Swiss-Prot record:
Tree of life domain: Bacteria
GO cellular component term of the entry, any: cell outer membrane
Ranges for region LT domain: 269-472
Entry note about domains: The N-terminal domain does not have lytic activity and probably modulates enzymatic activity. The C-terminal domain is the catalytic active domain.
SMART domains: PBPb
Region listing for Non-LT domain, in residue ranges: 19-267
Species name: Haemophilus ducreyi (strain 35000HP / ATCC 700724)
PANTHER family: MEMBRANE-BOUND LYTIC MUREIN TRANSGLYCOSYLASE F
Lineage: Bacteria, Pseudomonadati, Pseudomonadota, Gammaproteobacteria, Pasteurellales
Subcellular location, record wording: Cell outer membrane
Main location: membrane
Protein name: Membrane-bound lytic murein transglycosylase F
Keywords attached to this entry: Cell outer membrane, Cell wall biogenesis/degradation, Lyase, Membrane, Signal
GO biological processes: cell wall macromolecule catabolic process; cell wall organization; peptidoglycan catabolic process
Reported function: Murein-degrading enzyme that degrades murein glycan strands and insoluble, high-molecular weight murein sacculi, with the concomitant formation of a 1,6-anhydromuramoyl product. Lytic transglycosylases (LTs) play an integral role in the metabolism of the peptidoglycan (PG) sacculus. Their lytic action creates space within the PG sacculus to allow for its expansion as well as for the insertion of various structures such as secretion systems and flagella.
């Protein structure tokens, strides 16, 4: 009986082995199902990324970045906790994914055929290209043959396979790698003239130009490619299906558009002279008024209050407009009286009153507007008046949009200057196009201050590390 049972068990095992040999896709499917079930069982989604101002970073207000916000939303969509693991470069990131140490690689990664053969691809959520960068004011290269020196890229960069492929047709192409600097730091080194060229992703370059305007684009190294998440390789993927469903859902409910608005839209306009002037003001003027912005920030970041003041007056407490508004926050006489200040050219009085008035407007907004969007509605009202904000929200609803969604409302602001629209509104004509640009400028100024401070902090920490190393 025992012998019969043993032969039966062995026979069943052989049949299962044969089934796996004949139908290997079943084995792959089970393996993937096991991986996905492990994710669900551990109740944690492990996402790998790279520290970067657009993808993921931890600032004064906690974790932020495109990849973080998408990953957090995806984890919430699955009912899971999110664990973020950071890596120094894309090579380390893909190694971790291949070793199943993470479930998703998300770091502003452009689609690459070589990686697509090794891993599953999630849905694309924006597109970008690799570009060659040089210092503004030096000779611009228009093609690879015009490069006069080596390109410098970080060790493990995703652009290295692309450079290797291009070298086959351009044997004079040269580059070297460094493990001492991140891609963002290399962009700043180009701007400072410390290295001649680097290669970076187009959106990263646009972001860096608002911190260091001497960064200039020579030419596109590649065409635009989709930015994607990479997942473990399998011929059957429940995880991939969930990602695709989530991205489709996120697009339909406006999450993707909202993230693009937050991280990309302010990068579209780049004025070298304006950015250079602003960065100089951050270094020379802002320190004088920072204590006041911190003192009267209320529920805002002090950097936001500073950005508003720069948009209003370029941090000039004696600024005056032809319409009679005055001071660092450019207050009208009526607003000054309402906020009970006596001297609009007194920087402290003006900053306090401007902040209190903006908070007053924000606090009047309905709770149906998302908390993170209230600042933009409040700023629009600060610029053109509360009544006109009510009008544009009503107009947005009439046109089939959501009056509580800043993206919907924002695009209708210019319509307040069109007779066919304002003639039917309670408060009539308004220069809504100015309010639109006003909010966009403040968003850009705010991000520039935050990024500039982050870089200065990194430099300071690096100097301390170097001093500590020298002492030992």
């Amino acid at each position: 009986m025992k012998g019969l049972l043993a032969r039966l068990i062995i026979g069943i095992a052989l049949l299962l082995w044969a089934w796996d040999m004949i139908f290997p896709w079943q084995r792959l499917m089970r393996a993937e199902q096991n991986h996905y079930s492990q994710v669900l069982q551990r109740q944690t989604l492990k996402v790998g990324t790279i520290n970067h101002p657009l993808s993921y970073f931890v600032g004064a207000n906690g974790k932020s970045g495109i990849e973080y916000e998408l990953a957090k939303s995806f984890a919430d969509y699955l009912g899971l906790n999110l664990m973020i693991k950071t890596f120094d470069n894309s090579e380390q990131l893909f190694t971790a994914l291949a070793d199943n140490k993470i479930d998703i690689a998300a770091a502003g990664l452009l689609y690459q055929p070589e990686q697509a053969q090794q891993f599953q691809i999630g849905a694309s959520y924006y597109s970008a290209s690799w570009q060659v960068v040089y210092k503004k004011g030096t000779t611009r290269p228009y093609k690879l043959a015009e490069l006069q020196s080596d390109i410098v890229v970080p060790c493990g960069s995703a652009v290295i396979p692309i450079l290797q492929h291009l070298k086959a047709k351009n044997p004079m192409l040269r580059w070297h790698t460094t493990d001492q600097f991140t891609q963002e730091e290399l962009l700043l080194q180009v701007a400072e003239g410390k290295i001649p060229y680097t290669v970076a992703v187009s959106v990263d370059i646009s972001s860096a130009q608002h911190i260091s305007p001497n960064i200039a684009v020579g030419f596109d190294l590649t065409d635009e490619m989709p930015v994607v998440w990479y997942l473990p390789k399998s011929s059957y993927s429940e995880l991939q299906a969930s990602v695709l469903d989530f991205m489709h859902n996120a697009n339909d409910r406006g999450l993707i558009s909202k993230i693009e608005e937050k991280y990309f839209n302010h990068l579209i306009r780049f004025d070298y002279v304006a950015v250079q002037s602003y960065l100089n003001a951050i270094k020379t003027i802002l320190p004088k008024y920072r204590p006041l912005f911190e003192k009267y920030k209320g529920e805002l970041d002090w950097q936001m209050l500073a950005a508003i003041a720069y948009q209003e007056s370029h941090w000039d407490p004696n600024a005056t407009s032809p319409t009679g508004v005055r001071g660092i926050m450019m207050l009208t006489r009526a607003t000054a009286e309402r906020m009970k200040i006596t001297d609009r050219t007194n920087a402290e009085q003006s900053i306090r009153a401007g902040s209190e008035y903006l908070h007053l407007l924000i606090n009047q907004l309905p709770d149906t507007i998302a908390k993170e969007d209230k600042i933009w509605f409040g700023l629009a009202a600060y610029n053109m008046g509360w009544g006109h904000l009510l009008d544009v929200r009503r107009l947005t609803k009439q046109l089939g949009g959501d009056p509580d969604n800043w993206l919907d409302v924002k695009k209708n602001l210019p319509l307040l200057a069109e007779k066919r629209h304002y003639s039917g509104l309670k408060y009539g004509y308004a220069r809504g196009f100015e309010a639109f640009q006003y909010v966009e400028n403040i968003r850009r100024y705010y991000n520039s201050i935050v990024n500039q401070q982050r870089i200065e902090k990194q430099k300071s920490e690096q100097r301390l590390d170097n001093q500590s190393t020298e002492m030992h």
